[in-house]
Amino acid sequence: MAFFSCFALASILQGPASPDQLRVMVWNVLRGGNSVQQGPEKALQVIRDAKPDVVLLQESYDIEGDRPKLGAWLAGELGWRHFQGESAHLCVLTPYDIDATFFHHEWHGVGAKLKDPLGRSFVAWSIWLDWRSFVGYELRDHPEMTDAELIEAETKRSGRVNQAEALLGHLKTEGHLNESLPVLLGGDFNCPSHLDWTKDTQRVFERRRALDLPVSQLVVDAGFEDTFRKIYPNPVQHPGITWSPMYRGSLAAEEGTPQSFERIDRLYVHKMNDNLASKLVPVSAHVLPVVWESDQIPAEERVFPSDHGAVVIDFKWISTDPMSK
């Protein structure tokens, strides 16, 4: 069993095995790494170990001291490129060429057109939505709430639905919803997916119901596909939890009250249209950290320096040109 576990972990941490693969990481790095001892250095090591081709960062804030924002500092350490623009915290980080950049809102969306070493281009967006009235906490604190009242956590008591609609509207205006290139949309949605709140998960998880949660439904209705659920369609067998590996309860070594564990960090790929010369197909997925650290370790001393897990998705480039087959 120990041998199998080590082998499985080594397989996950291997980077893309061929030029036809693309690895994308989505990660909210907790306040620019400032909340954990040597947080920026630990974040750098996580990225180096994961070997992504693209990192969609959230909370890329100024590093305490005389260093720049986290994304800029990581790019310098890795010898990569990055785009954060006027955003307070959103960043696209990559070794690839950045041919164009896109800006929606300083808090909610930045994007970039990237080109890999073989000349294949795609668009990647880093996004973040309102954290208030987290539906899992609403159900935890008010278990008597009706389904309609819970949905209002998304539609009325937070700005998530309005922000998602504005973001998707901007992508449509930019032409990214009928783009002739693959389009990725990833980040911290601060809400679960309707694909995870089902009758089966309601039976297994203490704080879930079978609900058509609106934010993820909006994204799917706009033509995007949830890459993690494409690989792992069963949310009971593969929950993909990203909130929270750091804060898990109310023990002395932690902060806060018992959590509502959810997959709030996600990566979507837009369903391909007929004009694409090649498309990106998700082929594997995992969430970091693979093993959660002991909850007896104070949060500021953790090796994994964030309260959010990182989503890592491997894609394969598939040619749609019949002449290339």
Residue ranges and their predicted role:
Residues V36, Q58-D141:
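Structured beta-strand-rich core segments of catalytic domains in phosphoester-bond hydrolases
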Residues R31-G32, D62, D97-I98, L129-R132, ...:
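Short, solvent-exposed loop/turn segments at secondary-structure junctions
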Residues F103-E106, K113, T173-L184, C191-K325:
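Metal-dependent phosphoester-hydrolase catalytic domains
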Residues Q38, K42-V46, K69, W73, ...:
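Extracytoplasmic/secreted proteins, especially bacterial periplasmic and envelope-associated proteins
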Residues A2-F7, I12-E77, L118-F122, I297, ...:
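N-terminal, active-site-proximal structural segment of metallo-dependent hydrolase catalytic domains
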Residues V135-S158, D200:
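A solvent-exposed, charged loop/short amphipathic helix patch at secondary-structure junctions
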Residues L22-V29, A43-R67, A124-S126, A153-D200, ...:
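Active-site beta-strand/loop signature of hydrolases that rely on acidic residues for catalysis
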Residues R48-P52, A75-G79, I98, K172-H176, ...:
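Sec-exported extracytoplasmic/periplasmic mature domains
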